[in-house]
Amino acid sequence: MNLQHHFLIAMPALQDPIFRRSVVYICEHNTNGAMGIIVNKPLENLKIEGILEKLKITPEPRDESIRLDKPVMLGGPLAEDRGFILHTPPSNFASSIRISDNTVMTTSRDVLETLGTDKQPSDVLVALGYASWEKGQLEQEILDNAWLTASADLNILFKTPIADRWREAAKLIGVDILTMPGVAGHA
């Protein structure tokens, strides 16, 4: 089972404060473990424009049709001071990993320098921090009913209102997560 370019959807019983009602986009999954970004937990009072200001990046030339007031996500509990930018192609930045045909993760400053300009990728999600699982850990959490999985949907990843992503991701597999009981069993 390879879950790269999939969503992990937290089950209602998962009460960890960081992962409760979370949707995690899996960027990498192999025999050594998994790495992902939470895509529905906005950091309070931090917008993309705030990150650019902090890094002294001024979009030149500024394309006013591109909004920079989008929230920055808490990507996970690890390396919360490190930026991860999920975006649609191109992937010609200094430090990019192509996750799928339509999704790229970049960690280098050069992608930030395109934000707010006509060079910006068409869809962008900025996160600080990431989540990771050791070998076999994620698979065990899935067996323990901590997570549902669904193929990632770019509309949910980039366009669905943040507050609706958990419910909408579950709908991808026909689940109304708001009516699920807190504890699931094994069939």
Curated annotation (Swiss-Prot):
The lineage of its organism: Bacteria, Pseudomonadati, Pseudomonadota, Gammaproteobacteria, Enterobacterales. Gene3D superfamilies: VC0467-like (3.40.1740.10), VC0467-like domains (3.30.70.1300). This is UPF0301 protein YqgE. Belongs to the UPF0301 (AlgH) family. GO terms for cellular component: cytosol. SUPFAM superfamilies: VC0467-like.
